[in-house]
């Protein structure tokens, strides 16, 4: 198995509301697809290269993976969105707040020398928005 990830799928409670949240954050999608299949409705966001972020109803993800539906937990993992300045972190965090995200940690100086904050989307998924002065993010 080669070291890579092509697809991250987030289990959500309300596909339409979650899609609208990410669209308000500035992400583009062709909308909900796969509705012709039972348990198939999904939203896909192309992230560049061969990487995608998908939204899939939690109950359908449990069905498809044959894993019992579990309570959601925000601390199982976080998604990182890194930018090239502290100002960009502040801009993204402000947009997340205005879009309905829960700001779990306001942006500020990080213990590791950078600048970051955390928010949770409508389903509690944890996003870190950060700036690392030693890491240039390629757009």
Label for each model-derived stretch:
Residues 32, 38-39, 60-67, 105, ...:
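A short, acidic/glycine-rich surface segment
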Residues 19, 90, 127:
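Alpha-helical elements of the RecA-like P-loop NTPase motor core of helicases
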Residues 2, 9-60:
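Core segments of cupin and vicinal oxygen chelate
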Residues 56-65, 78-81, 130-139:
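Short, basic, helix/turn surface patches
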Residues 21-22, 70-73, 99:
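A short alpha-helix capping/helix-coil boundary motif
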Residues 4-14, 43-46, 53, 66-139:
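Vicinal oxygen chelate
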